Amino acid sequence: MFEIKKICCIGAGYVGGPTCSVIAHMCPEIRVTVVDINESRINAWNSPTLPIYEPGLKEVVESCRGKNLFFSTNIDDAIKEADLVFISVNTPTKTYGMGKGRAADLKYIEACARRIVQNSHGYKIVTEKSTVPVRAAESIRRIFDANTKPNLNLQVLSNPEFLAEGTAIKDLKNPDRVLIGGDETPEGQRAVQALCAVYEHWVPREKILTTNTWSSELSKLTANAFLAQRISSINSISALCEATGADVEEVATAIGMDQRIGNKFLKASVGFGGSCFQKDVLNLVYLCEALNLPEVARYWQQVIDMNDYQRRRFASRIIDSLFNTVTDKKIAILGFAFKKDTGDTRESSSIYISKYLMDEGAHLHIYDPKVPREQIVVDLSHPGVSKDDQVARLVTISKDPYEACDGAHAVVICTEWDMFKELDYERIHKKMLKPAFIFDGRRVLDGLHNELQTIGFQIETIGKKVSSKRIPYAPSGEIPKFSLQDMPNKKPRV
């Protein structure tokens, strides 16, 4: 059996960096090199301050960096020396041309394939790690075949990641399963077994599943679509709960105890975010349309539509509770990452809520413990989010949550950071304008509602009526939809 001794990973982002750090940690005899064209990102990986925040990541990196784990911008040499090359580059949703707003843009995958074949010789395994549409492996193989040379044998595998940001290291060290897809040929199966041997250093063999490449690619899209579907499903019920007086948490607990349903991903919120869920569901929608399956496409499109509705509904609730205007009012936004325990802001609901409030003229004071000021400004300066000098006029980045809340009309919790449960809300209430509102978009304060109301707060949360003096709000349809996929990024003023 072919033995993998050197691994190269192209892409030092949220997938490539943590994944290869754990592989190096678990396989000390394998030399792992993570490469990227972004020099500042590589410099960060080689510094005490890593470019991404993930619990446990720093300890893993420091345990093997400089021993068998290396970060470099020398892509060509890393490819030449490697037995296995992971492709772990971004596959964003297209913002132009055919499939705009839905199809995956594979230009970075194609660029990697061409660079790999140019710098390869002998036998090498090339593995998709990025989330890609079905048959992407076939496209890579066609590029390899069209540019082949003597004594070159490149085998293409699919090995999608199933880690969740915030628990990535735990997920990588103890995965539910490892999925490897390859050709159903002797050469393809040889490559599959070689990659299996790497994971068998720490993953039980029964947890390593092998399929053909198409099944592997579709499994990743389907997994994310099902998880997003569960969130949209419980969010739809949260709207019904608010209209009837039910509590969505109680409903979720009741149905989650049914073993056929389970209790995972039944947390109602202001909406899902992150780099994968929306992108992958839209990719699935586009695939179904391309294969002439319109009913299936419409079914999955509803997952995205419900997520958009939940965000617009929450923004409407804020505006209408504040006497139907937020113009020139200070509003504290607590949390900007798409979920706790990560600094990732991609498709974060905070961006959408901020956009809706800025359009109404609100002055936003934003605090997040892990998202740097520059990232918040970049996200809010997207042309689909803000206009001209809107961010400079309306957005302030606060150094702590108390500064953000000082003099505010309302506090809006958009990320479920644990620290928000521990804040001194009496101190916050004293410095806010009255009536003081808290809009809990993540239900992190569920156990504190009575205490907060005693202090004097008016509480609005997802899927439950809390404040008795509730002002009816306008239909969410009055807030127009927008998408971060609509336009290319512009250079922000930081």
Swiss-Prot record:
- Its Enzyme Commission number? 1.1.1.22
Q: Which domain of life is it from?
A: Eukaryota
Subunit comment for this entry? Answer: Homohexamer.
- Give the Gene Ontology MF terms in alphabetical order: identical protein binding; NAD binding; UDP-glucose 6-dehydrogenase activity
**Name of the protein:** UDP-glucose 6-dehydrogenase
Comment text on domains: The protein goes through several conformation states during the reaction cycle, giving rise to hysteresis. In the initial state, the ligand-free protein is in an inactive conformation (E*). Substrate binding triggers a change to the active conformation (E). UDP-xylose binding triggers the transition to a distinct, inhibited conformation. The presence of an intrinsically disordered C-terminus promotes a more dynamic protein structure and favors a conformation with high affinity for UPD-xylose. The allosteric switch region moves by about 5 Angstroms when UDP-xylose is bound, and occupies part of the UDP-glucose binding site. At the same time it promotes domain movements that disrupt the active hexameric ring structure and lead to the formation of a horseshoe-shaped, inactive hexamer.
**Gene name of the encoded protein:** UGDH
Cellular component GO terms, alphabetical: nucleoplasm; nucleus
Span list, region Allosteric switch region: 129-135
- For the region Important for formation of active hexamer structure, give the residue spans: 321-325
Q: Which PANTHER family match?
A: UDP-GLUCOSE 6-DEHYDROGENASE, UDP-GLUCOSE DEHYDROGENASE/UDP-MANNAC DEHYDROGENASE
Q: Which GO terms describe its biological process?
A: chondroitin sulfate proteoglycan biosynthetic process; gastrulation with mouth forming second; glycosaminoglycan biosynthetic process; heparan sulfate proteoglycan biosynthetic process; neuron development; protein hexamerization; UDP-glucuronate biosynthetic process
